[in-house]
Amino acid sequence: MGKNEQKDPNVYFFVPNLIGFTRVFLVLISLYFMSWHPNYCTIVYLYSSLLDAFDGWAARKLHQATNFGAILDMVTDRCATSCLLCFLCAAYPKYAIIFQLLVSLDLASHYMHMYSTLHQGASSHKTVTKKHNWMLRLYYGNNKVLFIFCAANEMFFVALYLLSFTPRTPPKLGYLPVPSFIYSTGELPLSYPTLLAVLCGPICLAKQIINVVQLVNAANALVKMDVEQRRAAKKLQ
């Protein structure tokens, strides 16, 4: 190797990717605690989610944005949320089909959106243009909006996770009588998880609407690409 030749950098050891690997490790730890220690699980899970904001910042700050890092980030998000929703299926069997649909919607919408944007020549699945729906432009075009929606979405599911455990001590605010289809015991504890669920629930619902819009937008883009390819093929015949 000549003196002027430089060795290719090891992308795996870029700072944003190391943060990504740390997130994966923390998610695995949270899964270990998930069924029997909600406090440990919640702390580790939320710490992993918090790091999601730092890997992107590090990538921009250190000029270490990579294709691998972008995919690692998205896959980690999808897998972590899916694992939590799988637990909620067992914790709330009456609503299992809802959580199953949420997992399916989350995976399908993000995969199809990524596939369509990259096939249209975009450098990232977060790249949106005027052709995209206004909701997607607002969602992906503003990092603060993206963070709020993603954080509230995760916090709502975490709140449901915490509520699935019987509190060791009675909540200071007492209990609220509710129908059994809302809470199995008929008495909803007025605790921090309850307040968190109430605050984050509407944003979580909006996030699911965005996922539907994202799915439809990606499907339309892929169909348009198919039509254009078939037209081009006919011209060559």
From Swiss-Prot:
**Which sites bind a CDP-1,2-diacyl-sn-glycerol?**
G56, R60, T66
Q: Which Pfam families match?
A: CDP-OH_P_transf
User: Which residues are listed as membrane-spanning?
Assistant: 13-33, 42-62, 72-92, 95-115, 145-165, 186-206
| Induction entry | Expression is regulated by both growth phase and inositol. Expressed in the exponential phase of growth. Addition of inositol to inositol-starved cells results in an immediate increase in pis1 expression.
> Which top-level group of life is the source organism from?
Eukaryota
One GO CC term on file = endoplasmic reticulum membrane
Q: Which UniProt keywords apply?
A: Endoplasmic reticulum, Golgi apparatus, Lipid biosynthesis, Lipid metabolism, Magnesium, Membrane, Metal-binding, Microsome, Mitochondrion, Mitochondrion outer membrane, Phospholipid biosynthesis, Phospholipid metabolism, Transferase, Transmembrane, Transmembrane helix
What Gene Ontology terms describe what this protein does at the molecular function level? Answer: ATP binding; CDP-diacylglycerol-inositol 3-phosphatidyltransferase activity; metal ion binding
Give ranges for the Lumenal compartment: 34-41, 93-94, 166-185
Recite the UniProt cofactor note for this protein: Divalent metal cations; Mn(2+) or Mg(2+).
Q: Which residues lie on this side of the membrane: Cytoplasmic?
A: 1-12, 63-71, 116-144, 207-237
Tell me the active site: D77
Membrane-related topology note: Multi-pass membrane protein
Q: Which annotated residues bind Mg(2+) 1?
A: D52, D55, D73
Q: What catalytic activity is recorded? A: a CDP-1,2-diacyl-sn-glycerol + myo-inositol = a 1,2-diacyl-sn-glycero-3-phospho-(1D-myo-inositol) + CMP + H(+)
Its subcellular locations are: Microsome membrane; Endoplasmic reticulum membrane; Golgi apparatus membrane; Mitochondrion outer membrane
The processes (GO biological process) annotated in the record are: phosphatidylinositol biosynthetic process; phospholipid biosynthetic process
In terms of InterPro entries, this protein maps to:
CDP-OH_P_trans, CDP-OH_PTrfase_TM_dom, CDP_ALCOHOL_P_TRANSF_CS, CDP_diag_ino_3_P_euk
Chain sites annotated for binding Mg(2+) 2: D52, D73, D77
Q: Which residues form a coiled coil?
A: none
Family designation: Belongs to the CDP-alcohol phosphatidyltransferase class-I family.
The function of this protein is:
Catalyzes the synthesis of phosphatidylinositol (PtdIns).
Q: What is this protein called?
A: CDP-diacylglycerol--inositol 3-phosphatidyltransferase
Q: In which organism is this protein found? A: Schizosaccharomyces pombe (strain 972 / ATCC 24843)
